[in-house]
């Protein structure tokens, strides 16, 4: 019977066949230890010389790293391994022999590994990170489906920028200028006026010449928009959502977190509600910590976010940023015209902002004023203005950056390890 490594616990003391690649091996005179992987997991196969034919043992000792195999044997429990099971091998059939595999068990530099990203993905650590990424995506759909949201797919090619910035990738759209989307938010607001509560999940693009460990040129975002939802209710949805994905990863990715040596105690305490501080309070906190490079009215950089997060062992909301450093569509605070009803969610352990969100302007006259202030004219933005003409309602939304969230939950240092094929300032291949 052919099974996967993940199915092995269901077949204890049974003889099965697994299609796998040889990730590593070691051998003595009488025993060969095969480290097998098949995409669903990793498992050790033990080949004992006295229990198999001469040909099988010779093959097991000489097969090269990353060769593909059919391995047959009996599944037994192995309490010493993280997986908990191993195979007592009776036969090895080589499908394809790999020669001179470039990523050997020794240490390699980052640039070398990035040049071979298509192969680096096969490693145990990268496999674990991708499985955690997958669990975050799975639990995202689970949460929003359970809460009555409708999945909507906004366009990737747009005629405008959601943020009103210049950090856009331009492309020709027949006889017109088009851009790769920075955010699906404007379209999601339109969808919310039709469907109530919606969310999208897709790639976004920022032409930022940034080389920090938190930035990618192409990254994926989860972007919910909600009609009849005001700022505080949106914050509650955000913290419940983040709590849900963290607990899902803890429940369903125990082995992967162990492979990554992640400190589980730091994740186990991530449960709503999250602390909230205002932008004003954050500025005061930074001053008390000795920061003299930030003044009221300026946005926070990575060192500032890290310093603020150090005061908490949970994600923390920073609310009510100055109007002038936030996007044109954010609703002013009812008691202060200089700040808006928005929040950034800062992850602990130095992982920075993982969510940005706000209540959106729902008043036509105020939005027209914002258009004028930001120089937003023409058909690219006219349709968005019309959302305030026909049955406008209070509404809010937010965007969660998937890769930063993966980095935080898996504990990896750089976001380049959180997406299969990262697009960086100096890297378009592989």
UniProtKB/Swiss-Prot annotation:
Primary location class: cytoplasm
The enzyme's E.C. designation: 6.1.1.22
SUPFAM superfamilies for the chain: Class II aaRS and biotin synthetases, Nucleic acid-binding proteins
MF GO annotations: asparagine-tRNA ligase activity; ATP binding; catalytic activity, acting on a protein; nucleic acid binding; transferase activity
PROSITE patterns: AA_TRNA_LIGASE_II (PS50862)
A GO CC term assigned to this protein in UniProt: cytoplasm
Keyword annotations from UniProtKB, A to Z: Aminoacyl-tRNA synthetase, ATP-binding, Cytoplasm, Ligase, Nucleotide-binding, Protein biosynthesis
Catalytic activity: tRNA(Asn) + L-asparagine + ATP = L-asparaginyl-tRNA(Asn) + AMP + diphosphate + H(+)
Domain of life: Bacteria
Subunit structure: Homodimer.
PANTHER family linked to this entry: ASPARAGINE--TRNA LIGASE, MITOCHONDRIAL-RELATED, ASPARTYL/LYSYL-TRNA SYNTHETASE
Name listed for the protein in its UniProt record: Asparagine--tRNA ligase
Protein species of origin: Oceanobacillus iheyensis (strain DSM 14371 / CIP 107618 / JCM 11309 / KCTC 3954 / HTE831)
Gene: asnS
């Amino acid at each position: 019977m052919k099974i996967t490594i993940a199915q092995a616990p269901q077949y204890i003391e049974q003889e099965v066949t697994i299609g796998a690649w040889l990730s590593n091996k070691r051998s003595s005179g009488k025993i060969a230890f095969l480290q097998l992987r098949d995409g669903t997991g990793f498992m050790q196969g033990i080949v004992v010389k006295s229990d198999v034919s001469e040909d099988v043992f010779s093959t097991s000792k000489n097969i090269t790293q990353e060769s593909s195999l059919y391995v047959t044997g009996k599944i037994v429990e192995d309490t010493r391994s993280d997986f908990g099971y191993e195979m007592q091998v009776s036969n090895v059939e080589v499908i394809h022999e790999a020669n001179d595999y470039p990523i050997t068990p020794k240490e390699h530099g980052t640039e070398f590994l990035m040049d071979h990203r298509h192969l680096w993905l096969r490693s145990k650590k990268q496999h674990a990170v991708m499985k955690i990424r997958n669990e975050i995506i799975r639990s995202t759909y689970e949460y929003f489906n359970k809460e009555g949201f409708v999945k909507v797919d906004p366009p990737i090619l747009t005629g405008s920028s959601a943020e009103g910035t210049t950090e856009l990738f331009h492309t020709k759209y027949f006889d017109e200028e088009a851009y790769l989307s920075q955010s699906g938010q404007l379209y999601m607001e339109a969808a919310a006026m039709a469907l109530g509560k919606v969310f999208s999940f897709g790639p976004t693009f920022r032409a930022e010449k940034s080389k920090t460990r938190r930035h990618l040129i192409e990254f994926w975002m989860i972007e919910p928009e909600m009609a009849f939802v005001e700022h505080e209710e949106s914050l509650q949805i955000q913290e419940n959502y983040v709590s849900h994905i963290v607990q899902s990863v803890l429940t369903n990715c125990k082995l992967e977190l162990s492979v990554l040596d992640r400190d589980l105690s730091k994740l186990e305490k991530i449960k709503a509600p999250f602390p909230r501080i205002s932008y004003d309070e954050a500025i005061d906190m930074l001053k008390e910590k000795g920061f003299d490079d930030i003044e009221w009215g300026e946005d926070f950089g990575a060192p500032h976010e890290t310093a603020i997060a150090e005061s908490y062992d949970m994600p923390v909301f920073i609310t009510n940023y100055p109007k002038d450093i936030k996007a044109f569509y954010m609703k002013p605070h009812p008691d202060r015209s200089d700040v808006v009803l928005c929040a950034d969610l800062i992850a602990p352990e130095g992982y920075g902002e993982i969510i940005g969100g706000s209540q959106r302007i729902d008043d036509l006259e105020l939005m027209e004023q914002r258009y004028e202030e930001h120089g937003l004219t023409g058909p690219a933005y006219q349709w968005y203005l019309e959302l305030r003409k026909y049955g406008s309602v209070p509404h809010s939304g937010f965007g969660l950056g998937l890769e930063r969230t993966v980095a935080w939950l898996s504990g990896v240092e750089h976001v380049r390890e959180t997406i299969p094929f990262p697009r960086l300032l100096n890297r378009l291949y592989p």
